[in-house]
Swiss-Prot record:
The keyword Transcription regulation applies. It is an enzyme of class 2 (transferase). Its cofactor is a divalent metal cation. This is tRNA N6-adenosine threonylcarbamoyltransferase. HAMAP family: Kae1 (MF_01446). Belongs to the KAE1 / TsaD family. Its EC number is 2.3.1.234. Substrate binds at residues 145-149, 177, 192, 196, 287. It comes from Yarrowia lipolytica (strain CLIB 122 / E 150) (Yeast). Pfam families: TsaD. One of its GO terms (biological process) is positive regulation of transcription by RNA polymerase II. Binds 1 divalent metal cation per subunit. Component of the EKC/KEOPS complex that is required for the formation of a threonylcarbamoyl group on adenosine at position 37 (t(6)A37) in tRNAs that read codons beginning with adenine. The complex is probably involved in the transfer of the threonylcarbamoyl moiety of threonylcarbamoyl-AMP (TC-AMP) to the N6 group of A37. KAE1 likely plays a direct catalytic role in this reaction, but requires other protein(s) of the complex to fulfill this activity. The EKC/KEOPS complex also promotes both telomere uncapping and telomere elongation.
């Protein structure tokens, strides 16, 4: 029995996360021949006033200001007094926002050289998937990856996470965030969460554009349309079928439309690969209504839905630590000269050689 430790750093958007994970290997030849222990999972979020998004330069400044303190807290909580005992430093290499990514990469390079520990660059999406699989116990699910910057339907095949469908323009989380700005919905704890709470009070469904093209979907049109409705609402001039539409109705209608599109393409992928499992990952995956709608579809197919809570579905350092350690145990290491971050790092570029 052998134990391995990894420290992970995540900072691809407005959340800065640092986590420490331990793998205890009991059978090195088996894909699942190890157990995981989460030793720490610390996160700090850059939050802007209602009606405002977060700019890359300001987000990067937040990460630079907090990263040392967050690393210290993560090590203290994990009870690691000698960080040279870590087996690897894992960091998000992409995709994401350039400036925040760069801030975290610099921190990873610095501590790796200070402590003499190898670096492992991690694909952000693969981190979400592997953490989701570990936490939920899903074996070989179709993955719906939904966040502020990404929307993809994924399935595993031949040591790659294959993309079956994705957004053609903006991500579902970005659509929700931008709508929240129009209505000046608060950004704390997140605009998507606040939209979800308002949607629970919505009673009137307002028809919105529904754009699914094969296995792909488009959300820029529905955003533009619902933004125009929101401006009419703010002017007190939004009546549908004799009903005075409220902000809650608009939130409800937007959620129902977007999530129906996601359920449709996910079901089509399940049918294609003959899967009975759906794993929802990414920040939007915390949404209970999305989980409910996906569950209705899955039950109709005698399947099941897997999702994690906000500790793991929202961007975090522990998922990066976990995915990085999986790769490191297979002999992967990112040389210092190859640690440049990239905003375009496709999920299917990663060789997933820790799976059979």
């Amino acid at each position: 029995m052998t134990t391995y430790l990894s420290l992970g750093l995540e900072g691809s958007a407005n959340k800065l996360g640092v986590g420490v994970i331990k793998h205890t290997v009991t059978d090195a030849n088996a894909e699942n021949g190890f157990s995981t222990d989460i030793l720490s999972n610390i996160r700090d979020t850059y939050i802007t006033p209602p009606g405002e998004g977060f700019l890359p330069r300001d987000t990067a400044r937040h990460h630079r200001n907090w990263v040392v303190r967050i690393i210290k807290r993560a090590l203290d909580e994990a009870k690691i007094s000698d960080p040279t005992k870590l087996h690897c430093i894992s960091f998000t290499q992409g995709p994401g926002m350039g400036a925040p990514l760069q801030s975290v990469v610099i921190a990873a390079r610095t501590i790796a050289q200070m402590w003499g520990v190898p670096l492992v660059g991690v694909n952000h999406c693969v981190g979400h998937i592997e953490m989701g699989r570990t936490i939920t116990g899903a074996t070989n699910p179709v993955v719906l990856y939904v966040s502020g910057g990404n929307t993809q339907v994924i399935a595993y095949s031949k040591q790659r996470y294959r993309i079956f469908g994705e957004t053609l323009d903006i991500a579902v989380g970005n659509c929700l965030d931008r709508f929240a700005r129009v209505l000046k919905i608060p950004n704390a704890p997140s605009p998507g969460y606040n939209i979800e709470q308002l949607a629970k009070k919505g009673k009137k469904y307002v028809p919105l554009p529904y754009t699914v093209k094969g296995m792909d979907l488009s959300m820029s049109g529905v955003l533009q349309f619902v933004e125009s409705l929101a401006k009419r609402f703010q002017a007190g001039d939004l009546v549908v079928d004799g009903h005075q539409v409220t902000a809650e109705d608009l939130c409800f209608s937007l959620q129902e439309t977007l999530f129906a599109m996601l359920v449709e393409i996910t079901e089509r992928a399940m049918a294609h690969v003959n899967s009975q499992q759906v794993l929802i990952v990414g920040g939007v995956g915390c949404n209970e209504r999305l989980q409910e709608m996906m569950g209705i579809m899955a039950r109709d197919r005698n399947g099941s839905v897997y999702a994690t809570d906000e500790r793991f579905c929202i961007d975090n350092g522990i998922m990066i630590a976990h995915a990085g350690l999986l790769a490191w145990r297979q002999g992967f290491e990112t040389k210092m000269e190859k640690t440049q971050c990239t905003q375009r790092f496709r999920t299917d570029e990663v060789l997933v050689d820790w799976r059979v």
